[in-house]
């Protein structure tokens, strides 16, 4: 799974334009975060990575693609802190983090790091 980090201009309608272009192609956005402080961007996870890349290229958007690592955490206090500490103790920097699905006893999460292969090894993936 991958995330798409798309550069935007910080003005009204930018998110709507990108989200509409993706949705018009039948692509579902599974997770998304947008920022508009110093530079505007939207980072999204979709159900069709190839089609998403094509839409963004066809729009002439600047974007980067990062590998997402999927794992499941217990839905209990401290679970996220435990995982983050395990990675931090090994010098791994978490770049992005998504809660993809929450259930009573578990949380499916996705993250990007500066060392995906080592992250997978540490998390037993």
Question: Model regions: which residues?
Answer:
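A conserved regulatory-domain signal marking ACT and ACT-like small-molecule sensing domains
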Residues: 1-125
């Amino acid at each position: 799974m991958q995330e798409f980090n798309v550069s935007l201009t910080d003005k009204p309608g930018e998110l709507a334009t990108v989200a509409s272009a993706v949705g018009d192609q039948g692509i579902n956005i599974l997770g998304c975060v947008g920022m508009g402080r110093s530079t505007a961007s939207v980072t999204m996870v979709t159900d069709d990575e190839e089609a998403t890349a094509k839409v963004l290229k066809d729009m002439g958007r600047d974007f980067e693609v990062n590998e997402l690592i999927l794992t499941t955490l217990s839905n209990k206090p401290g679970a996220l802190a435990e995982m983050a500490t395990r990675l931090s103790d090994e010098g791994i920097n978490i770049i992005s983090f998504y809660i993809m699905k929450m259930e009573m006893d578990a949380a499916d999460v996705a993250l990007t790091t500066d060392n995906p292969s080592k992250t997978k090894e540490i998390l037993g993936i």
